[in-house]
Amino acid sequence: MMVYIMNAFDIKSTKMDVLSISLHTSDLFDLEDVLVKLGKKFQESGVVPFVLDVQEFDYPESLDLAALVSLFSRHGMQILGLKHSNERWAAVAMKYHLLFCLSHSENVKELGQVEVQKTEDGQKARKTVLITSPVRTGQQVYAEDGDLIVTGAVSQGAELIADGNMHIYAPMRGRALAGAKGDTSARIFIHSMQAELVSVAGIYRNFEQDLPDHLHKQPVQILLQDNRLVISAIGSE
């Protein structure tokens, strides 16, 4: 793996094993009872970080997230992020300074997720996640085991992650990471290249200065060649 070294710090890819807890009730008293019973186990491990899966709740208003964060914290558990198949939860996560993980479920048609049919040899094809709204500063979208298509503008400080390819049909000012699980054949296609950072299969490049005119704010594709990131104008020879 290559690491791009900057003056003050290094950027490199990493993977962490983090618990995912699926929430089945919004009743704080019921949750308190369970956490009290499990309290000793968690206290022995120190602070336990985890992602809270809120897929069973359709609307953010159905949960008192501030109370949930406080409740889990009192019992030695720290919520790192929220997981849901509806991107409206991203704004809620950002409000509480949490990460947002876009999950997959059978009822995410409003997000435009496409379950691709099996290929002729019976292998399951990649899924595609479509995001049509802007991705704002502090938000993170992750297309797990599939490709990501974004048609809304991506703000500086926002992050897009896909295990497969990435297509961004709008100005891209945030971070784009394709091939997140190591797929070196993944590519990134950007309609208007203004990204802070791009990565394919863990190989990064950040942009402290604007690219040359034939690439800056122009349609580009980004791919790996000989373990190096190559950025080229779409349509160029």
Curated annotation (Swiss-Prot):
<keyword id="KW-0132">Cell division</keyword>
<comment type="function">
    <text>Cell division inhibitor that blocks the formation of polar Z ring septums. Rapidly oscillates between the poles of the cell to destabilize FtsZ filaments that have formed before they mature into polar Z rings. Prevents FtsZ polymerization.</text>
</comment>
<dbReference type="InterPro" id="IPR007874">
    <property type="entry name" value="MinC_N"/>
</dbReference>
<dbReference type="GO" id="GO:1901891">
    <property type="term" value="P:regulation of cell septum assembly"/>
</dbReference>
<dbReference type="GO" id="GO:0051302">
    <property type="term" value="P:regulation of cell division"/>
</dbReference>
<dbReference type="InterPro" id="IPR016098">
    <property type="entry name" value="CAP/MinC_C"/>
</dbReference>
<dbReference type="GO" id="GO:0000917">
    <property type="term" value="P:division septum assembly"/>
</dbReference>
<comment type="subunit">
    <text>Interacts with MinD and FtsZ.</text>
</comment>
<keyword id="KW-0717">Septation</keyword>
<dbReference type="InterPro" id="IPR036145">
    <property type="entry name" value="MinC_C_sf"/>
</dbReference>
<comment type="similarity">
    <text>Belongs to the MinC family.</text>
</comment>
<dbReference type="InterPro" id="IPR005526">
    <property type="entry name" value="Septum_form_inhib_MinC_C"/>
</dbReference>
<keyword id="KW-0131">Cell cycle</keyword>
<dbReference type="GO" id="GO:0000902">
    <property type="term" value="P:cell morphogenesis"/>
</dbReference>
<dbReference type="Pfam" id="PF05209">
    <property type="entry name" value="MinC_N"/>
</dbReference>
<protein>
    <recommendedName>
        <fullName>Probable septum site-determining protein MinC</fullName>
    </recommendedName>
</protein>
<dbReference type="Pfam" id="PF03775">
    <property type="entry name" value="MinC_C"/>
</dbReference>
<dbReference type="InterPro" id="IPR013033">
    <property type="entry name" value="MinC"/>
</dbReference>
